[in-house]
């Protein structure tokens, strides 16, 4: 989503200030008067945009049915970087979208989201169509679930290190591990820190 326009920010600031000073939200009529809008439809368009941004919650059946959402309620917006295989590797494709995730999933560092295709990680509760939240890092510990690039294609698997050998293990007994035969064509992109089954597209 694009940033708020100056007028959209002014409307949000007015609502927030009114709630802070009066203890309740302004009505749509009051918002229209404050900004010189000629119709309530214009007000509703602004409220829809602010709600889509996760800044407000509305109750259309209440005259003053606006509530501000806190930062923790809004969650974190992370880039959806593409699709990753939980079967055989497929290419990660950049997609211009963001996903809102619970802030408890996101710690320090840079994070991104990938959509999972395939069922090789069902034993870890990651199924086809899920979204994995990934902390971007170039290293990982034995046993961690990682997103890795193998021959320039992305896959999500458990990382196993056996002496000098690297293996990518599925969490599905019907599938075989992937043995990394050429370390020069292998790179860890990050560690999976969360899974989202029902997500909100921002």
From Swiss-Prot:
Catalytic activity, EC: 3.4.21.88
Pfam families: LexA_DNA_bind, Peptidase_S24
Alphabetical list of InterPro entries matching this protein: LexA, LexA-like, LexA/Signal_pep-like_sf, LexA_DNA-bd_dom, LexA_repressor, Peptidase_S24_LexA, Peptidase_S24_S26A/B/C, WH-like_DNA-bd_sf
DNA-binding region ranges: 28-48
GO biological process, one term: DNA repair
Domain of life: Bacteria
Record site feature (Cleavage), residues: 86-87
Active site: 120 (for autocatalytic cleavage activity), 157 (for autocatalytic cleavage activity)
Entry similarity comment: Belongs to the peptidase S24 family.
Task performed by this protein: Represses a number of genes involved in the response to DNA damage (SOS response), including recA and lexA. In the presence of single-stranded DNA, RecA interacts with LexA causing an autocatalytic cleavage which disrupts the DNA-binding part of LexA, leading to derepression of the SOS regulon and eventually DNA repair.
Protein name: LexA repressor
Gene expressing this chain: lexA
């Amino acid at each position: 989503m694009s940033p708020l326009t100056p007028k959209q920010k002014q409307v949000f600031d007015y609502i927030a200030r009114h709630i802070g000073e009066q203890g309740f939200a302004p009505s749509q009529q009051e918002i229209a008067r404050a900004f010189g809008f000629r119709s309530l439809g214009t007000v509703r368009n602004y409220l829809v945009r602010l709600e889509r941004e996760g800044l407000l919650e509305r109750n259309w059946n209440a005259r003053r049915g606006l509530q501000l959402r806190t930062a923790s309620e809004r969650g974190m917006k992370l880039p959806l970087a593409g699709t990753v295989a939980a079967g055989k590797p497929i290419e990660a494709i950049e997609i211009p979208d963001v996903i809102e995730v619970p802030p408890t999933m996101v710690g320090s560092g840079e994070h991104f989201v990938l959509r999972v295709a395939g069922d090789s990680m069902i034993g870890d509760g990651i199924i086809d169509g899920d979204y994995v939240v990934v902390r971007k890092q170039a290293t990982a510990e034995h046993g961690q679930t990682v997103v890795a690039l193998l021959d320039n294609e992305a896959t999500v698997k458990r990382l196993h290190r056996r002496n000098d050998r690297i293996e990518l293990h599925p969490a599905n007994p019907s599938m075989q591990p992937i043995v990394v035969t050429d370390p020069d064509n292998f790179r860890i992109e990050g560690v999976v820190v969360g899974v989202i089954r029902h997500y909100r597209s921002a």
